[in-house]
Amino acid sequence: MRQGILWFSGIFLLVVIYFLSAPALAHVPVFGGEGKSPETAIHIEDPSKSRVLYGELDSGDLRYYGFNVEKGERIVLGLIIPVEDGNKGFTPSLILIGQGLADEGKVPEKLEMPEGYGAKVLSYSLPESPVYEGFTPSAFYSLAKFDIKAPESGTYYAAVGAIQEAGSRKGEDAIQEKGLQEREIPIEGNYGLILGYKETFTLKEWISIPLSQIKIYRWEGQGLFLIFTPLVLTLAAGLLAIFLKRETVVGFSPARISGILAGLLFLGTGMSYIFQMLISLSKSSFSSEVFITFIMIFASVGLGVAAIALSLKDESYGTGSASKRLYFSGLGIAGLLFWAGWFIGPFLAFEAALLPWKHKG
């Protein structure tokens, strides 16, 4: 009993640290949308909410995002690209379009603007080193950051383009003065548009992060086989152990089997975090956000060990009491909050809490 209290005290401490750090460092990932022109721009409801809008560009493409801002409100923009695309020379343009803005930089001929609008073309060069992000975990090049107050109330547009020319901007607010330049851009590449500054999540956005993680790894250029290799190997090792002990396992109740499988999925998530952390660190420099990844790893592994340990206890453990239901319900909730188990792990933990613990017959 004391050991179980220590386990859950440790997990509770991780939850506190995790949720104190998450709002300050994480962005809501968003995928999809067309936005081929200002008229069909991808509309953003709350431009102050911090999010990353992921997309892909072919050569010559421009993608438009529209949002409404009141005069004096902050407009915060940023642009990131995968490490592989950046190493190939893909550096898309980032342009802010709006009322009260003076044209700065060389505005592309293909850029569409409503009448009376101005455009700020952000100038930048590829950074020396990619950035490590601890929650996914991932690595990327951060190309540009832009933070101004809206000069007028109205609709503003952020345009990301894979165009063949980009020039520096003039004016006191220029981010970097690089001089007019012509550059060839690869045929296509991926990008992430950062918009907003308030780090908030809805419950749905938070719980659905595991699906977004897979999409982000794909955005980076990873294949599904590579993404799921750590999880598959962990499950394979666990199932092999079950097979070798099949004479014992055959007498397990459905609740115990569900608990063991939930534990394996939690452990597999921890192995995936380790795997992705090593991949990302091999591309980027060391960052303090590594400690966020360690929290994710320890949480997933801790949940996995706890689920398996509880499942292997004597079959009469928790029968007819609230203890078993409480423990596995807690594991299921923690799995959802820590993005452990790819949804299936928490589901199996809840199943273990509900199914009969004692094997019939």
Annotate each PLM feature:
Residues 113-149:
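Extended, solvent-exposed segments with strong compositional bias
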Residues 21-23:
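N-terminal signal peptide c-region/cleavage motif recognized by signal peptidases
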